């Protein structure tokens, strides 16, 4: 039976989450950089976003699964991560498509981060941590997304988009790693037993 001591450290969770999800985002953004027009034509815009969401879930669950101990180990972690990332993607795309531009992006990041936090908190049965999880995810998401967008603007083209993915994935992955760490540590506190 796993215990508090078997949960990966916060440092390991930040580093493994950041680096692992950075590689995931690099792969996903590479398909955007090289195949966006083709995917839009074959799958429609909404189908392309669904494809990218599925790719994030497939690769992200694999990259982040080692940070979870106990009952949420692979493949069960895929279900939790899949629901969390799908909720995030749904919130982000709904607001982005409704509002467009900067307002759609930042409100999408906010709502998506809140939805992801709710799913993780519910999955680990630490509902009191929703606000902390949402704040962690939103701040890191904001930094990674907009700093990555700035890098994309500076470099442009395929390289810019791929670097955007690296920056975005590094920050969001580190935040997800932190959330997974705190969620598991919180589970072992007496009030959650």
Task: Annotate each predicted stretch with a short phrase.
Residues 67-80, 120-135:
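Membrane-helix interface "capping/anchor" motifs
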Residues 125-193:
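C-terminal transmembrane helix-loop-helix hairpin of multi-pass membrane proteins
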Residues 32-53, 71-76, 89-110, 128-129, ...:
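Membrane-helix interface and helix-disruption motif detector
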Residues 13-21, 50, 57, 80, ...:
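Small-residue packing motifs within transmembrane alpha-helices
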Residues 1-74, 178-193:
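N-terminal topogenic module of multi-pass integral membrane proteins
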Residues 53-64, 110-121, 167-180:
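Hydrophobic cores of alpha-helical transmembrane segments in multi-pass inner/ER membrane proteins
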Residues 19, 76-92, 132-143:
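Transmembrane alpha-helical segments of multi-pass membrane proteins
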Residues 89-104, 115-125, 136-137, 141:
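Conserved mixed alpha/beta catalytic, RNA-binding, or beta-rich assembly cores of soluble enzyme
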